Amino acid sequence: MNRPERLQPGVKLRDADKVSRIPVKIVPSERDTMLRKPDWLRVKLPASNQRILEIKQALRKNGLHSVCEEASCPNLAECFNHGTATFMILGAICTRRCPFCDVAHGRPLKPDAEEPVKLAQTIRDMKLKYVVITSVDRDDLRDGGAQHFADCIREIRKLNPDIKIETLVPDFRGRIDAALDILSTEPPDVFNHNLETAPMHYRKARPGANYQWSLDLLKRFKERHPNVPTKSGLMMGLGETNEEIAQVLRDLRAHNVEMLTLGQYLQPSKFHLPVERYVPPAEFDELKALADELGFTHAACGPLVRSSYHADLQAQGKEVK
């Protein structure tokens, strides 16, 4: 039996190379079998791309990454033109192979010790008032990257004292308590961790993750920081039923999660999980009504909603869909 080829540090694996060794094998989609994208998912492009170019140049100049680009978010043009970006720390290579996600897999490089300062300076130069900080999974690090998150928050606040910071964190697999000890030294203004889908779809969509661990992470953070809102996001279109999603919403509320995002899954390439259905806007409206009934303080539900889509407006309790 041949051993898998050892990954080289810093090499990005995408598409077929990325998903070649996950538990549920994916058959590449043929064009004639892919569902046609409905009109309600068509994205309007901004009249000018000047602000988009400015943000991209600022990121390149400082060697920073945005999840908007790395994960091929459909809202990139709108958010960049609005002057917002979700920064992705700890590199652009993830140690996991989730087949819904377009972020590259591989063996990451050592964290950049200068990244927290460069990030803080970039945010100051961009005159941002609300930022979202996320990361790839770093299962190679003893703390899962928690200290780097804390360092980034500290440096950002040094140079930007009036800023609001939302963190979208990984699950810190097997290191939850240690990670929370570290994160508690520099708590964010909003703590976000995405469940992504219903538990019965984890094996195919989130190999290496655990539904209950993710719920526990959200609950334990809230127990330590009762005044910091907790938030989670889900995708639809992976084969789940609306009742399965409804149960996830109940589970989130049972674990004291207050904010919700719910959007449509879009297949990044033919090598990723296929879209099993496009969920009509009316069904998102029904799930939002349920979320409101369950007591979420804010629920952004719509086909193009993403976890950090207009996160500043979400945090202010304004309608986003």
Curated annotation (Swiss-Prot):
What does it catalyze? [[Fe-S] cluster scaffold protein carrying a second [4Fe-4S](2+) cluster] + N(6)-octanoyl-L-lysyl-[protein] + 2 oxidized [2Fe-2S]-[ferredoxin] + 2 S-adenosyl-L-methionine + 4 H(+) = [[Fe-S] cluster scaffold protein] + N(6)-[(R)-dihydrolipoyl]-L-lysyl-[protein] + 4 Fe(3+) + 2 hydrogen sulfide + 2 5'-deoxyadenosine + 2 L-methionine + 2 reduced [2Fe-2S]-[ferredoxin]
The record's listing under InterPro entries reads: Aldolase_TIM (IPR013785), Elp3/MiaA/NifB-like_rSAM (IPR006638), Lipoyl_synth (IPR003698), rSAM (IPR007197)
Top-level enzyme category: transferase
Specify which residues bind [4Fe-4S] cluster 1 according to the UniProt entry for this protein.
C68, C73, C79, S308
The GO terms describing molecular function are: 4 iron, 4 sulfur cluster binding; lipoate synthase activity; metal ion binding
Q: Which UniProt keywords apply?
A: 4Fe-4S, Cytoplasm, Iron, Iron-sulfur, Metal-binding, S-adenosyl-L-methionine, Transferase
Any Pfam family matching the protein = Radical_SAM
- State which pathway it belongs to: Protein modification; protein lipoylation via endogenous pathway; protein N(6)-(lipoyl)lysine from octanoyl-[acyl-carrier-protein]: step 2/2
Q: Which cofactors does the annotated protein need, by name?
A: [4Fe-4S] cluster
Q: Cofactor binding mode, per the note? A: Binds 2 [4Fe-4S] clusters per subunit. One cluster is coordinated with 3 cysteines and an exchangeable S-adenosyl-L-methionine.
Localization recorded for this chain is: Cytoplasm
Where in this chain does the record put each Radical SAM core domain? 80-297
The positions annotated for binding [4Fe-4S] cluster 2 are C94, C98, C101
Q: What is its EC number?
A: 2.8.1.8
Task: Show the GO cellular component annotation of the record.
Answer: cytoplasm
- Where the protein is mainly located, per its record? cytoplasm
What NCBIfam families is this protein classified in? lipA, PRK05481.1, PRK12928.1
What the entry lists under PANTHER family is as follows:
LIPOYL SYNTHASE (PTHR10949), LIPOYL SYNTHASE, MITOCHONDRIAL (PTHR10949:SF0)
Family of the protein in this entry? Belongs to the radical SAM superfamily. Lipoyl synthase family.
Q: What name does this protein carry?
A: Lipoyl synthase
The organism's lineage? Bacteria, Pseudomonadati, Pseudomonadota, Gammaproteobacteria, Alteromonadales
> What gene is behind this protein?
lipA
